[in-house]
Amino acid sequence: MLTKLRMYITSDDFEITRHISSVLHGVIMSAIDTDYASILHNSNLNPFSTSLVKNGDEWCWTVATVGQEAYDKIFKVLADKSFSSFVLTSKENAVVNIVKKETFEIPVENLLKATFNDEPSSVLKISFDTPAAFKSRNDYVIVPDLHLVFQILMKKATAATSDDSFFDEETLDALVQNSKIISYNLRTVKFSLEGRRITGFTGYISIYIKGPSLLKNFAKTLFRFGEYLGVGIKASIGMGALSIKEDEK
């Protein structure tokens, strides 16, 4: 099961900014079962992602989950009507109110069927809605390297579906060799995390994909998973949120 919960938040006690995104991760950890929170803390690939984005005058806090356990222990807890406000101790006990919630649910099988039945797209336009970055050879990468993008998306899709066929080096090589960025509009942005700043990038890239239809649809499927799991580092804390904005046949 893939889910998204959009929570529109306000506060009379302080001005909400994107810099509280990592603080909201702590709100989730406090709201869910403590044993499950400990498991997530030690997990390399978390079954959820978060983002905080301003839509017009509204701040939208999105929490997405993959898998039944995350659905039961994260999504259901936060989607419950009793979770209507919370306190940020790091902001002098400021109260944050949730004024509206929107929920979206789709079985993994339905996502796969819908994407693979689509007419193949040669160009995918991908928007990075919150700062994204990667780790490679113990260093940060702050540009959208397609090898790293596809690699992490394949690993996340594998973890989400428990299907090892989503990741193999031959398919990864085929994706990288048959894809290239043909246009982009990117900028570097700082992401606040526990008193320090991580440099990432936001904006969009258009990826041209050649080769067979199966490869094109597989690439689109990976980005569909990315819309729920994010891409790159710290996706559970608010980095790496992405969306497919449009595609061209």
Predicted regions and their residues:
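RNA-interacting cores
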Residues: M1-K249
